[in-house]
Design a protein with these regions (language model features):
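Periplasmic polypeptide-binding modules associated with outer-membrane biogenesis and secretion
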Residues: 1-192, 197-200
Length: 203
């Protein structure tokens, strides 16, 4: 993992053909820099990489440690987050770019009587923050527990501003939340009276 390029070189000699290899050694690293990370600090991610300044870059080791970063994001629920690019600049600094799968928007669908804000205010997953499956699951439970819906589902759509982002669509199936009260009364002036009251509680 210490070489970026290995090329065979064949040379004719009296005994036949001599085989040599021309190698390009990976650069010596002077540090590591992270871009796009908000969930974990650069200090925490630097500990994941464990790169010592002055060492020749080992691409195999870097690949393994990058997978460790991806696994940490996934373990904590950030299922769309991953290392998106790695490069070494002329000064030997290793730059690691991370995309975290930002939620661009949260859009209710299927609600005809229930106002959008009644649904979205129950979401603990917020717009502008990295998508987290645990927060989305809790949000769906909160929406369902409102008692207005027979079914609540989430669809993930590609982001419009950035394909690495996501738009959350909350698809709900409303049940009848209206209440009807029937009653009857009697007065000397009006005789028998009917009482009908109708109310909606999902506003």
């Amino acid at each position: 993992g210490y070489f970026s390029e290995v090329n065979p070189v064949f040379t004719s000699v009296p005994e036949g053909v001599k085989l040599d290899f021309a190698v390009t050694v990976n650069p010596v690293t002077t540090g590591v820099s992270f871009e796009g990370n908000t969930v974990y600090s650069s200090e925490v991610l630097t500990k994941f990489m464990d790169i010592q300044p002055g060492q020749v870059l080992n691409s195999v080791s870097v690949g393994q440690k990058v997978q460790g970063i991806n696994a940490a994001y996934a373990r904590d629920g950030y299922m769309l987050a991953h290392v998106d690019g790695i490069r070494v600049d002329d000064q030997g600094v290793l730059h690691i770019h991370i995309v975290e799968g930002i939620v661009e928007d949260i859009i209710p669908a299927g609600n005809k009587k229930t106002r959008n804000k009644v649904i979205t205010r129950e979401f603990v997953q917020k717009k502008g923050k990295p998508f987290n499956k645990f927060l989305v699951r809790r949000s769906v439970e909160r929406v369902y527990n409102l008692g207005f819906f027979d079914d609540v589902n989430v669809r993930m759509l590609p982001g419009e501003q950035d394909p690495n982002n996501v738009i959350i669509e909350i698809d709900v199936l409303e049940h009848k939340t209206g209440t009807i009260t029937l009653g009857a009364g009697y007065s000397k002036s009006d005789g028998l009276m009917g009482i009908v009251e109708f109310g909606e509680d999902n506003f």
